[in-house]
């Protein structure tokens, strides 16, 4: 796979600690959302996915829905 173009990164935090980082990368033929999840009792982040989509629109929709869920759960989500 060739180097992709990073489209955006979203960083979710709750109570001053990282909860998740979502990164969308466009590879031309597909768009991939890479995620890092920070469990409460873990010393390091866990990787979930990657989640592969046909285009940036689908990847953006996935991240938008994930961000909405994180906000509903009380997280602050910011562009990173």
Q: What kind of feature is each model-predicted range?
A:
Residues 9, 21-22, 33-35, 53, ...:
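Hydrophobic beta-strand residues in large extracellular and virion-surface proteins
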Residues 20-48:
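Short aromatic-glycine-(Arg/Gly/Cys) micro-motifs in beta-strand/loop hairpins
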Residues 4-21, 25:
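N-terminal acidic leader/helix
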Residues 1, 77-80:
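Short intrinsically disordered terminal tails
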């Amino acid at each position: 796979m060739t180097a992709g173009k990073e489209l955006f990164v979203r960083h979710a935090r709750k109570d001053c600690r990282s909860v998740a980082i979502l990164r969308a990368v466009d590879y031309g033929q597909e768009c991939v959302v890479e995620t890092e999840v920070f469990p409460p009792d873990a010393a390091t982040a866990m990787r979930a996915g990657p989640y592969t989509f046909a285009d940036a629109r689908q990847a953006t929709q996935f991240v938008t829905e994930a961000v909405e869920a994180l906000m509903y759960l009380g997280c602050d989500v910011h562009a990173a």
